[in-house]
Amino acid sequence: IHAHDWLTYPAGVHAKMVSGKPLCIHVHATDFDRSRGKVNPTVYSIEKNGMDHADCIMCVSELTRRTVINEYHQDPRKVFAMHNAVYPLSQELLDIPRPDHSKEKVVTFLGRITMQKGPEYFVEAAALVLQRTRNIRFVMAGSGDMLNAMINMAAERGIADRFHFPGFMKGKQVYEVYKNSDVFVMPSVSEPFGIAPL
C-alpha cells in the first residue's frame, strides 16, 4: 500500500489494518514545511499517525527525512530519501523556439502561488529591480490562494505594467514559459524538493 502525503495517510492506514499488507508512505512535505513553523496540530496528528503506522517512509529529500526523524520521532531505519526525477524532454519540447530578448529580459516565477512558495518576495524583488531598470518583464505563472494578493501587490508597487499573470500552466505551456525566460526565480521559504527546477 502506497500513500502520498498527509491527506491519503488515513486511507493508507485503514487499508493496512484491513488487509494486513505493509504500508509505505511518501512524504512530499510536512506541515513544518508548509506552515513556516506554525504547525497545525490536526495536520501534525494525521501526519504522525500515518508515519507511526508506516512500514517504510519515503521522503523527497534528506531535509525532509531529517524533519520526519526529528520532529515526528520516527525510526531512521525505516525513513529513506527518494529524490524526484524527470524523463528526458521530447524533441518537440526541445525545439520550442526561443524569442529574441535583446531589448527586454524576462524573469519568471512558476509554481503554486502560496505562502510556502514565497511569491511576495518575487514581487518585492521585482519592485527593487524596476527602480533601477525598466527593460525587464516579470511573469508569475501559477495559481493559488495568494494570486489576487500578488496582483494587488504588483499594482500597489506601481509595477503592474511590467508583470504578467498567465495563470496555471500545464504540459507544453510550462516548457514554453521556461523557454521564454531569461531567468527562473524560486523564492520558496520551504522547498523540501521542488518539481519546478527539474
Per-segment meaning from a language model:
Residues 19-24, 32-49, 88, 92:
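Nucleotide-sugar donor phosphate/pyrophosphate-binding loop at the beta->alpha transition
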Residues 63, 85:
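Carbohydrate-associated surface elements
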Residues 100-126:
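Conserved donor-binding/catalytic core segment of Leloir-type glycosyltransferases
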Residues 149-169:
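Nucleotide-activated donor-binding/catalytic signature segment of Leloir-type glycosyltransferases, i.e.
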Residues 189:
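Aromatic "clamp/platform" in nucleotide-sugar-dependent glycosyltransferases that forms part
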